[in-house]
Design a protein with these regions (language model features):
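C-terminal accessory domains/tails appended to large, multi-domain proteins
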Residues: 1-147
């Protein structure tokens, strides 16, 4: 569940940051660090980096966005609470009737999917219902409250 939560939040942050800073979402790549508590401290971290080649300061522009992480997080949570394909998207569970989507919960091209080069897991293992309350799911599943 922790990985699904981190991965879904990462995609929401990629979209939020790309809308604000001008980088296309396809040029922002994720790296997820997630490990359970097995005698060691549990690990849960997201690294977003730009993969676009360009003029000096390409990475600097993305680094600057770290100072606005609160704003990006709020915007990401707002974006995750509703999808253009709700209630169909929001009500989907990994155990649902759609065998081809057994690795996704509430996730689709309208809300969580990003360009495949940006995603280290090829848009699998995603569920925005674990991040924020969505239509068709128990709100207690969500880590964050409704924005």
């Amino acid at each position: 569940v922790r990985f699904y939560l981190l991965h879904s939040l990462s995609h929401l942050l990629i979209t939020s940051i790309s809308l604000h800073c001008g980088y296309p979402s396809a040029s922002i790549h994720e790296r997820l660090y997630c490990a359970p508590h097995d005698g060691e401290p549990a690990m849960a971290a997201i690294l977003l980096a730009t993969g676009s080649a360009g003029a000096e300061g390409t990475l600097g522009g993305l680094v600057e966005e770290g100072r606005r992480i609160g704003r990006h997080l709020r915007r990401a949570l707002e974006m995750g609470s509703l999808c253009a394909n709700d209630p169909v998207c929001g009500g989907h569970t990994p155990e649902g009737d759609y065998a081809e989507r057994f690795l996704e919960g509430a996730a689709c091209h309208g809300c969580l999917f990003v360009a495949e080069p940006s995603c280290e897991r090829f848009n699998r293992f995603l569920d925005r219902a674990l991040v924020v309350p969505t239509l068709g799911q128990d709100p207690r599943l969500a880590f964050f409250d409704a924005p």
